[in-house]
From Swiss-Prot:
NCBIfam families: PRK14520.1 (NF011093), S16 (TIGR00002). Keywords: Ribonucleoprotein, Ribosomal protein. Residues 160-174 have a biased composition (Polar residues). It comes from the Bacteria. Residues 135-158 have a biased composition (Low complexity). Residues 98-118 have a biased composition (Basic and acidic residues). GO terms for biological process: translation. It comes from Acidothermus cellulolyticus (strain ATCC 43068 / DSM 8971 / 11B). This is Small ribosomal subunit protein bS16.
Length: 174
């Protein structure tokens, strides 16, 4: 029976994730596997490659043939060089350790405690129908006009009409 070490595709569309498996050469790409011996995630930075070196060495020793992509992965991990007797490759890149969430939270809390609190940078939204600022402005303008109209009877009629127009213009239209 011809045995191959190859990749089976898992994951979602545009988010591939592969398993390194040992399978019969006649099975489908994602068909039944004899054994899963590793994982490969190309979307992470740096790419995640996990291989069970003991099982890879066993399957290569009994004659399993790796496909080209798997052979490249085994060269990166150094398993292919161990099998063929070649010198070891340079070490793989490793992901930087993630910062401790508790330490980040404490640092942010200390930073926030030292800063003086200020007003919000954006103003509050006004309510849609009743704009208080618009209602008070015409009324404030009407009061001085009414006082002036009491002093001048001839010009008072026109200013009172203007003040009434100003209040009717300021009312919100439904």
């Amino acid at each position: 029976m011809a045995v191959k070490i190859r990749l089976t595709r898992m994951g979602k569309i545009r988010a591939p994730y592969y398993r390194i498996v040992v399978a019969d050469a006649r099975t489908k790409r994602d068909g039944r596997a004899i054994e899963e011996i590793g994982q490969y995630d190309p979307k992470q930075e740096p790419s995640l490659i996990r291989v069970n070196s003991e099982r890879v060495a066993y399957w290569l020793s009994v004659g399993a043939q790796p496909t080209e992509p798997v052979k490249a992965l085994l060269k990166v991990t150094g398993d292919w060089q161990r099998f063929t007797g070649e010198p070891a490759p340079p070490p793989m890149k490793t992901a930087p350790p993630k910062p401790d969430k508790k330490a980040l939270f404490e640092a942010a809390a200390k930073e926030a405690a030292g800063e003086p609190r200020a007003e919000a940078t954006t103003s509050r939204k006004r309510s849609g129908k009743h704009d208080k600022g618009a209602e008070t402005t015409p009324a404030a303008e009407a009061a001085p006009d009414a006082a002036a109209s009491a002093d001048e009877p001839a010009g008072g009629a026109s200013t009172a009409a203007e003040s009434q127009d100003a209040t009717t213009d300021a009312t919100p239209s439904a």
